Amino acid sequence: MKVLKFGGTSVGSAQRMKEVAKLITDGEQKIVVLSAMSGTTNTLVEISDYLYKKNPEGANEIINKLESKYKQHVDELYATQEYKQKGLEVIKSHFDYIRSYTKDLFTLFEEKVVLAQGELISTAMVNFYLQECGVKSVLLPALEFMRTDKNAEPDPVYIKEKLQTQLELYPDMEIYITQGFICRNAYGEIDNLQRGGSDYTASLIGAAVNASEIQIWTDIDGMHNNDPRIVDKTAPVRQLHFDEAAELAYFGANILHPTCIQPAKYANIPVRLLNTMDPDAPGTLISNDTEKGKIKAVAAKNNITAIKIKSSRMLLAHGFLRKVFEIFESYQTSIDMICTSEVGVSVTIDNTKHLNEILDDLKKYGTVTVDKDMCIICVVGDLEWENVGFEAKALDAMRDIPVRMISFGGSNYNISFLIRECDKKIALQSLSDMLFNNK
């Protein structure tokens, strides 16, 4: 059995939903994970913001506009009056439910319930369309089997057990439709897997059913070897190792959510990135296979802050780095890059929520300097240290660009450069020319 996930743009209109239906109805049994229609989650966040500010009138105005859009989608999606009516009833039910939260105290709990409505609506609409077309499909409520534990991490044992129970109720179905993103927490409350969580849902489901393949369908032709919005002549990458894909996803390749990789990797289930706008394109296959000695892609991560701590007390001392790291840990701030010398250490962070407190604590140990508006450029591939030559190529491409930090050796798949954000475009283009375009 395969697991297919379609993002918001892939189900962003009635026509797109019809195209998705064509893609999934090939006679093979499969589980299909759907996001909310594009723009819906952002609008639900906007509604929530109004309710936090105790402005139910503003919230209701947006609710009415969104409901009108959905009524139009229903009219365009279904051919028969019977299913138009079914669609309208679903729309009314969910929007009445959203409106019920405009009358009382609004908290984070209520916001998560409101945000869940987008996926619940899109899956109901697609399931009805498949049934109207005569396809044997059924809706599997994600809230019946997707759960996180007390640490807000997915509970794979629970997911596998409860999902199997749901599947056994409908053994003869061709298509099982379910929601991405949404789940219940350890206390049974409606929750979610955060933004991009639909990828995570698909990967968790794939691992739970031991899928033959997980397919992530978006509006892009697989993972590219550089950012096509910035760089000329990028090309799709046809094959990636799981660790290469994880590096690229973390460092800015938005086609895939970083957390999606792990369940599939550990279950050894290949993940294929495909394009709903060009379904015949080969896309990108992610697996545990490695192409030896090959550089695959370049990615960039913005909004990076670099912090340098210089201290003579670090010279020949033990325990200094532990004290530094404990400061970042106490403020729940992750470090992206790190470089050390005999008398100093430089680190980068992308979460500056507690920057001032961190700097105050670090000043106890030495002189602290900060560089903001920085960017991490990440070169990804099979970069085992025995493979010679790739460092020289990457450094040669960066020869005219001021580099604040270089990180290599922590991973066999990544060499990272810290530069100013204003130099990002020229750095990405130069790396593409040197590594992929043979200039």
Positions of PLM-derived features:
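A conserved regulatory-domain signal marking ACT and ACT-like small-molecule sensing domains
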Residues: 282-439
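A conserved active-site cap/scaffold subdomain adjacent to cofactor or substrate pockets
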Residues: 241-287, 291-310
